[in-house]
């Protein structure tokens, strides 16, 4: 477990108490969002097995994953006796016909996934969880969460289009290889 300070001021401070929340995520995109919002935060890395809720609906899966990440981060913070600050977690999944699609393992896997979505409507779900620990007990965690679901219709895709998209390097660490450039393949 490591801490990494992210400050929006011109001088970055490492391992200080001068931050507002913990971000329990290693996602560069989530860090970028908080930086753009001028939130002072520290990254609290916690290893959490996201396969615990594989029998759940996509909605329940993403909600439970986000909440459990928050509880896991709280346990690490408490174990390491770190300052009691709120914890922010998030998770994004892509689902088609009730099946959850994760990050691609390689180029061939990414192309196969994208072709499965070709010409079809699917859901992108993001859950954000904000957890606070009771300052008196430092054990009870109160959590608030919100789930946003977006329905997206893909245009018909060819294997060549999918391969070219993979070569942009954008999709390699995202659920369903889903980066901003993929929007060119949405049916309008």
Predicted regions and their residues:
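N-terminal G-site helix/loop of the GST-like fold
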Residues: 18-44
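Short, glycine/serine-rich, charged loops/turns that create anion-binding
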Residues: 28, 48, 135
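Short, acidic/turn-prone active-site loops that include or flank metal/cofactor-
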Residues: 45-52
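Anionic-ligand binding patches
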Residues: 2-6, 10-22, 35, 57-188
């Amino acid at each position: 477990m490591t801490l990494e300070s992210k400050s929006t001021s011109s001088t970055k401070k490492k391992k200080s108490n001068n931050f507002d929340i913990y971000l329990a995520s290693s996602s560069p995109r989530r860090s970028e969002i908080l930086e753009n919002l001028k939130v002072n935060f520290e990254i609290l890395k916690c290893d959490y097995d996201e396969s615990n809720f594989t029998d759940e609906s996509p909605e329940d899966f993403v909600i439970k994953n986000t909440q459990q990440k928050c509880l896991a981060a709280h346990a690490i913070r408490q174990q390491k006796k770190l300052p009691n600050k709120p914890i922010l977690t998030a998770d994004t999944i892509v689902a088609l016909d009730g099946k959850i699609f994760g990050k691609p393992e390689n180029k061939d896997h990414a192309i196969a996934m994208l072709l499965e979505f070709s010409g079809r409507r699917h859901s992108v779900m993001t859950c954000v969880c904000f957890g606070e620990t009771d300052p008196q007990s430092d054990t009870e965690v109160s959590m608030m969460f919100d789930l946003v679901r977006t329905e997206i219709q893909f245009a018909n895709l060819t294997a060549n289009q999918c391969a070219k998209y993979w070569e942009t390097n954008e999709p390699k660490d995202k659920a369903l290889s889903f980066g901003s450039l993929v929007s060119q393949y949405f049916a309008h």
